[in-house]
UniProtKB/Swiss-Prot annotation:
Record keywords: DNA-binding, Transcription, Transcription regulation
A Gene Ontology biological process term: negative regulation of DNA-templated transcription
Cited InterPro entries: Bact_HTH_transcr_reg, Chorismate_lyase_/UTRA_dom_sf, Tscrpt_reg_HTH_GntR, Tscrpt_reg_PhnR, UTRA, WH-like_DNA-bd_sf, WH_DNA-bd_sf
Name used for this protein in its record: Putative transcriptional regulator of 2-aminoethylphosphonate degradation operons
Record-annotated DNA-binding residue ranges: 36-55
NCBIfam families in the cross-refs: phnR (TIGR03337)
Entries under CDD domains matching the protein: WHTH_GntR
Transmembrane segments: none
Listed SMART domains: HTH_GNTR, UTRA
Sequence ranges assigned to domain HTH gntR-type in this UniProt record: 8-76
Gene Ontology molecular function: DNA binding; DNA-binding transcription factor activity
Alphabetized Pfam families for the sequence: GntR (PF00392), UTRA (PF07702)
Amino acid sequence: MKSIPGDIPQYLLIKAQLQARIQSGALKSGDKLPSERELCAIFNTTRITIRESLAQLESSGLIWRADRRGWFVTPERLWLDPTQNTNFHKLCREQGREPKTALLSGVLTTVPVEVMEPLQLQPFDQIYLLTRLRYADGRAVCYCENHCLPARVPELLQYDLNGSLTEVYESYYNLVYTSMHLSFYPTAMPAQAAQALGVMEGRPALLLRRLNYDQHGRVLDLDIEYWRHDSLRIEVDTH
C-alpha cells in the first residue's frame, strides 16, 4: 500500500477525496461511482488500495454496492419517529420515496421460542410466519419477519401480502395498529437477512423489534426487522 509524505496511507487520502465530492454535492444521492478500474487510473493506484477506500466509505454509510452493478452514493436515510403511528409504505411516501414490499415466504408454523412470551403463546402453538423484503426507491433496505396470530387474523395467507400488512388488517379484519413496544440496537447481519439484502453476513445492521397492539389494547403481532446500517435513522421529539 502506498503512502505519501506525512505517512497517511493512500487509501485514506482517496477516501477523503471521494468523501469530499459526496458531501459537497458533486456526487449526489444515487449517483454511480466510476468502476474500480477507472478509479485505479484516476488515482494512479492499485485495485487493492481502491477497495480499501471504498470499504471505508461503505462502513461510513456514504456508499453502497449493488451486486454486479457497482458502487453508488447512498440515498438519504429514512427517518422513523417511534411516537408516530405509521407503517413502512406510508413512511416512505411521506418522505418522497417509493416503497415496495415483497413476500419471500409465508407459512403456518410452530411459534419460535424467542417470541413465545411476548405473543403470550404456549410452546407448541402455531403462528403465521411471514418473511418479507422492503424496498425504498428500488433498493432493498429491510428484511422483516412478521409473527402473526392465527386467532386474530385467521386465513391470513390467502391474501396478497406483497404490500402493507396494516392495510390487510384494516380491510379484512377491522384491526388497527394503535400502539407498540419498540426496541432497537445495532447487531450483525444474520445469514438469511444478508442473502436477501445482498450484503455480506456479519455486516453491521440495525435490528428493530416491535410488539404491536390493536385498538382494543390486545397483542396483534410481533415484527423483527433487520435494516441496512445506512438506511434508517430514528428520531424522537419530546417537546
